[in-house]
Amino acid sequence: GAGAAGRCGAGVGGQLGLKALVLDHSENVAEKVRTSGGGRANFTNVDVTAANFLSENPRFAKSALSRFTPADFVALVKKHGIAFHEKHKGQLFCDRSAEDLIAMLLAECAAGGVERWQPCGVKNIRFLASSPYGSCASSYEIDSDRGTIQCGAVVIASGGLSIPKIGATDFGYRVAKQFDLPVVTPRPALVPLTFDEAAWAPFSQLSGLSLPVS
């Protein structure tokens, strides 16, 4: 996946000396970042804690957030000279555009020598009990639109089903089921209200406003 998570993971891995390759079925990069925050990317919240997450494994959020904190990401944003501001309740937005954040992700990958195959669909992933491709204790083979790839590890960063029109698919769920990982049936958590033209007319001037509701 060539979104924020995939790009961050590949960039960090590459800079730690790993050979990293990013595959994505879409030609675009970080589309969800591009559309978030009204085009300015609400990229983190300085007040977020593990208590803000619901999970069957609460320790995961605590562990993940202790290893890479909002402050760590803010430091990365500052390193790339991206201007930002706090809007409401700890929410941070780019001053100019989400494109600045996407450029940062690409620059971090370039610094790590990350390869990129886009568009490139993944047809199948196979786990090999022992690796014939070097010193790795185990290995994977990936059948892609551009051929077969051998690797020591696979990171699935394909996102969820939230916005199909920007390329979201059920790929991650299918891979999880293939490897017998438990999957909680997904349910919509953030949904729009849709109107036809006549019904929308009285509210059109309210576009772009937000408010807390309960």
Where do the model's predicted regions map?
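Glycine-rich Rossmann-fold phosphate-binding loop(s) that bind the pyrophosphate
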Residues: G1-A5, H25
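Small-residue (primarily alanine) positions within well-ordered alpha-helices
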Residues: A5, G9-G14
